[in-house]
Design a protein with these regions (language model features):
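Acidic, polar-rich low-complexity tracts and alpha-helical solenoid repeat scaffolds
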Residues: 1-161
């Protein structure tokens, strides 16, 4: 029953769009409050100790954190800002998005870590989470430059001939 409440809270959370129709601060407060409600209910599900619903709830919470981060990254700077001001605005949003991604990653990593090996996963929450988590983790490293490694001619050791 608690998980069904989590699903309805997630639906309410997802309905709150960051679209600029209302002041962004108001939209952010509403979305953050909805996320907090979802997190509290998810903690209640986890406290019950039922592995099946705990996994489902943890996955949903991690998904919500990622969705919030995605919504922040999709925002554009207000037309009243230009140049460095617009870049600074977008940088703040990006920093907040990466914090949400980090929390989502921690939630999902914990879900995967706590799943005992060989454990039955009847609803596939662990495998679903792994499938979605690994590409997310890889995205963190896309902006890092590739390192060039010098190539050195290898010589056969004297005892190898």
């Amino acid at each position: 029953m608690d998980y069904l409440v989590c699903l309805s809270l997630h639906a309410r959370f997802a309905e709150i769009e960051l679209d600029g129709a209302a002041p962004l601060a108001t939209q952010l407060e509403r979305k953050q409050a909805a996320l907090t409600d979802l997190a509290e209910r998810s903690r209640a599900v986890l406290a019950r100790g039922n592995a099946r619903w705990s996994r489902a709830s943890a996955h949903l919470l991690g998904q919500s954190l990622y969705e919030f981060g995605d919504a922040l990254l999709a925002l554009e700077a207000p037309p009243s800002l230009s140049g460095d001001d617009a870049l600074a605005y977008l940088e703040v949003l990006e920093d907040q998005a990466w914090q949400l991604y980090s929390r989502g990653e921690s939630t999902w990593s914990e879900l995967v870590r706590l799943a005992p090996s060989g454990d039955e996963d009847p609803d596939n929450w662990v495998s679903i989470t792994k499938t979605e988590l690994w590409p997310r983790i890889a995205r963190r490293f896309l902006h890092l430059p590739e390192l060039d490694y010098p190539l050195v001619q290898a010589e056969a050791p004297p005892w190898g001939s």
